[in-house]
C-alpha cells in the first residue's frame, strides 16, 4: 500500500497518489517514475484507502483509473468526495481512461478531474500531464496565490 519509491535524498519530493487495484499498472507507473528523484509514488489499492491517503498525506497530484470501480466506489464518486473536502478540493486528479472520446473527456472534466490521460499509460503524455498538475499544485499551495483571493 503506502510509499514505494527511491530513497529520499535532497529536498522534499512531490507526492503522487495512484489509486489502482492492479499491481502491473502500479509497476508501470513506478517504472515511468523511477528516474525522478523529486517524486514519491504513493499507492492505494482501493478508493477508500485512496481518500484516507489523500486527506492524510496531502499529495500534490492523484492518478486514478476512471473506467473501473475500486472497492465499490466509482471514480466519479471518488472525485465527488475529494471535491467536497476542503483539504482535497483543489488537488489535481488525473483520470486514466480507456474512453477518450470528446464526450467522455468533457464528462470527466465537468465532474472535477484535472485532466484525462489515455490508457494504456504512456511516458510522454503521462509526464506532461503530471508536470502540469504539479505546477498547478505548487501555485495552489503557495503563500501568494491570486486564485485564492478570488474565491
Regions found by a protein language model. Give the residues of each.
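C-terminal output helix
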Residues: 121-130, 142
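Acidic, metal-coordinating helix/loop segments flanking the phosphotransfer/catalytic sites
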Residues: 43-61, 68
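Short acidic/polar segment at the start of the alpha1 helix of CheY-like receiver
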Residues: 22-28, 70, 100
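CheY-like receiver
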Residues: 2-3, 7-12, 138-151
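Two-component/phosphorelay signaling modules centered on CheY-like receiver
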Residues: 23-42
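Short, glycine/charged-rich "phosphate-handling" switch motifs in NTP-dependent
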Residues: 114
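Short amphipathic alpha-helix used as the core "switch/output" element in two-component signaling
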Residues: 52, 74-89
Amino acid at each position: 500500500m503506502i510509499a514505494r519509491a527511491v530513497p529520499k535524498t535532497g529536498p522534499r519530493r512531490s507526492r503522487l497518489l495512484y489509486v489502482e487495484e492492479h499491481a502491473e499498472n502500479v509497476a508501470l507507473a513506478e517504472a515511468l517514475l523511477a528516474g525522478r528523484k523529486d517524486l514519491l509514488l504513493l499507492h492505494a489499492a482501493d478508493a477508500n484507502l485512496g481518500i484516507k491517503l489523500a486527506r492524510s498525506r496531502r499529495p500534490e497530484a492523484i492518478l486514478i483509473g476512471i473506467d473501473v470501480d475500486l472497492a465499490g466506489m466509482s471514480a466519479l464518486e471518488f472525485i465527488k468526495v475529494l471535491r467536497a473536502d476542503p483539504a482535497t478540493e483543489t488537488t489535481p486528479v488525473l483520470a486514466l481512461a480507456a474512453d477518450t472520446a470528446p464526450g467522455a473527456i468533457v464528462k470527466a472534466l465537468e465532474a472535477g478531474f484535472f485532466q484525462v490521460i489515455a490508457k494504456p499509460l504512456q511516458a510522454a503524455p503521462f509526464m506532461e500531464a503530471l508536470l502540469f498538475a504539479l505546477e498547478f499544485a505548487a501555485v495552489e499551495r503557495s503563500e501568494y496565490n491570486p486564485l485564492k483571493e478570488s474565491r
